[in-house]
């Protein structure tokens, strides 16, 4: 199929593409060029209400559709994503600024994997039963909630959009989904793919717009019974404050200030390779990035020398150039925020070991938003730079002397999303993993994902878990039936 992209995107509601009721649009900017190359609907509560009505109409039939038939449709969506990988990857890169090779190798394949995984998973999602000897039998039904809201971020647009939508649909719900207004293209194209795959009208409704206008309306709508959100902790706090009095189910995957704990007995070459990825992958715009690098003191200077040498050779360039290792920052606002964070780090006494500046390219990217990969040392644990999420190509490095000190430093954060531990001592790895306050721990690797496992954070990094059975439980209501005999 040919995924044509119009200049003016439209909402996907009730199986149709329609403009915003207000007639208002927002500019869509390519971060690599700084140029406007399209417009998206500036949707509001009225558009959301139309989407909810379409979802309510579709829900009775979709909720009882046999899982074998749901599998066929959801698996077809996965196949069409694979078939259109080139077009989807280019759209993702133009919207987000990430290197095209990354969109092709990671983002789009993962989007199809999300649909394929939950298409299969729902067929094995079993109800529970408990027999009370000679008294009674209990069985627990897992039934779809109804209409749910899925709000996704701009850093991994289609990857995380489908991570929410696929299990929600598989569980029998109808969805009102809002992609980030900064990266709307692949969400728009997903609507076309779902239509082609035979997803019934109204089962998935994609409404574009800003958080205050559109996202707020989704959270506040009385007929939307659950909200799955990925984004900043501040936005998550606001969503929780709005949704809690309405008793909505909430899944909030929020920020992180993740420690990368490196002991001197690790596999050195593998650690360096993966630490480059975990520090600067997707320009550091991944909530799981290890932005606080904690090193055993005996390895500190050697690591610093090799790390700086590698980082200085990371090519920052046009995302369409296959030689570019680092692409553009997603928006001018975020670009300016990151540069301001680097200035604050200097004011706090940090030493810039590498990077720290905007990058000025030539040609089509002359007005794009590019920043050098940046390494900072000499900061205290409690300073703003080490405590607040920057969400960019910026890492700090700090030494530690003992295992206990490493754990204390790792836990010195209001966040608790992820952590990475590097050591060949399996006993040490288990001790540290048990004590680090994070929902996801990687040992001698980073971002190795099994979609069957729980995904989510502790402390200010969120509420609830996604992935596997956890997310299917979230998107269903448990009903216990007790029969006495």
Residue ranges and their predicted role:
Residues 33-39, 224, 261, 315, ...:
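Conserved C-terminal structural/oligomerization subdomain of aldehyde/semialdehyde dehydrogenase
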Residues 226, 234-380, 443:
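ALDH superfamily catalytic-core signature
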Residues 127-270, 400:
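Rossmann-like NAD(P) dinucleotide-binding subdomain of oxidoreductase/dehydrogenase enzymes
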Residues 37-43, 58-64, 150, 260-263, ...:
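Short, well-ordered beta-strand elements within core beta-sheets of diverse protein domains
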Residues 59, 63, 78-85, 89, ...:
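Structural signal for hydrophobic packing residues in well-ordered secondary-structure cores
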Residues 15, 34, 70, 92, ...:
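Residue-level signal for inorganic ion chemistry
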Residues 1-32:
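Hydrophobic face of amphipathic alpha-helices that form TPR/SEL1-like repeat modules
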Residues 35-125, 135:
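Glycine-rich loop-to-alpha-helix module at the N-terminal edge of alpha/beta enzyme cores
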